[in-house]
Amino acid sequence: MSERDYAPVWPVPERTSVLADTSIEIVRPRAFGQVPKHALFDFDGTLSLIREGWMDIMVPLLTGHLLPYAKSDETPERIVSLVRNFVTELTGKQTIYQMIRLAEEIRLRGGVPADPQAYKAEYHAALMARIDSRRKGLADGSIPRESMLVPGSLDVLAALRERGCAIYVASGTDEPYVLEEARLLGIDAYAAGRIYGAQADHASFSKEMVIQRILKENAVDGAALIAFGDGYVEIADCKSVGGIAVAVASDETARSGKCDAWKRERLIGAG
């Protein structure tokens, strides 16, 4: 099952409301037929900030691979813009999809690309070099967990658990790293045995598959599901089965707790 592409299907409303005494924006009010008993969370950017800054690694790396194949009328600036646009467009899907797109762009320009998995491995090595100190600091306690979490993450997880809600995590990051980083952040205490990530065979995993598994194994319909995410995939997938979608328009860089305007518009469009 392939992952859906981004397609804005909902307009951004001119007016919304805010839940009293919170910064939670209510974009589309709805009546609750039942209290959700299954909560699905995206990982990076929704709960974890360990990989904050990943785009600053990916865009230059992919640009470097595509530049040698630029057409005569394509300036370096135009290639950078192209790469940034498709990386942004595919954010929320598994990393391999951005590498597949790179290979397609090289092929369109008459080049012979490497295997997308090779590009992914190169990117991942560069990213791990950037975040290694964060992971080590979390492991030895020199970096507090709170500094690598989206503000309020553990409070939300604890509140859901107290209300009898089963918690799941699904990420486009490779599963072994999601498991390890969830442990470093203390998230595994809330979702043990229910943390999923990308597989070597990318076609064998998607967030839609995780949602269908939750519904099937628990014999419930989509109304029993609530999903939290800063990516369009989990928002659109949750809405497609009738669940409640909570967009997390997180400011990853400053960790300010304020809304990221670009994420907000994109997530509202997704549902």
Name the predicted role of every residue range.
Residues T46, M58, S142-M148, S153-R183, ...:
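Substrate-recognition element of Asp-dependent hydrolases with the DxDx(T/V) motif
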Residues F205-C238:
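Conserved Lys-Pro-Asp/Glu-containing loop-to-beta segment of HAD-superfamily phosphomonoesterases
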Residues Y6-S81:
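Active-site neighborhood of HAD-like aspartate-dependent phosphohydrolases
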